[in-house]
Amino acid sequence: MSRFYFFFNLICLYLAIKSALSAELDTNDQKYADLRTTGRGESPDSTGPDSDTLRRDDGAEGLNKRAAAMWFGPRLGKRTIAADLHDDLVEEFDAEPLGYAGEPPQKLATELVQGAPYMVLLVTAKPRKPQPIFYHTTSPRLGRRDSVGENHQRPPFAPRLGRNLPFSPRLGRSYNGGYPLPFQFAY
């Protein structure tokens, strides 16, 4: 039965990803076509001094701006991204449809689910069995005294010594608190 759940979840996940990707590719077909023809996300008829330099930078013979900015070497941490390149990257990131635009991830997830024809809930946890209800009744602890609430004083001597009263060599002179003292302490 668990294999069935696994394959069902796998198929549902595949369908959800496929439908989400197909919906995104349909909306971006024009952008990807422009990217294939010009090398950038511009329309093919856009000409100007800027588009030629960008195509030359993105060509196979030279490094593009992104590759130049991501240089990992002995000066790691000392190289900074140029301000204009940083602005270009931020604009490109903001133009992406799946880019993070300051929205919470729950909103992005609901937008993806609303655009997809299927809704998938992955059930991976095993179903819980209901716990049996036990009615607990207290039973007396065998070998114990019945009166738990009373103060039981421990015997002053261990039973192996054979004594059952505290040793008092000066009988009559010890104060146990049972009678008042003839004198009072001044505090």
From Swiss-Prot:
Residues 34-58, 132-163 are annotated as: Disordered. GO terms for molecular function: myostimulatory hormone activity; neuropeptide hormone activity. Residues 1-22 form the signal peptide. One of its GO terms (biological process) is neuropeptide signaling pathway. InterPro entries: Pyrokinin_CS. The modification Leucine amide is found at L76, L142, L161, L171. Keywords: Amidation, Cleavage on pair of basic residues, Hormone, Neuropeptide, Secreted, Signal. It is found in: Secreted. A hormone that controls sex pheromone production in females and pheromone responsiveness in male. Also mediates visceral muscle contractile activity (myotropic activity). Belongs to the pyrokinin family. This is PBAN-type neuropeptides.
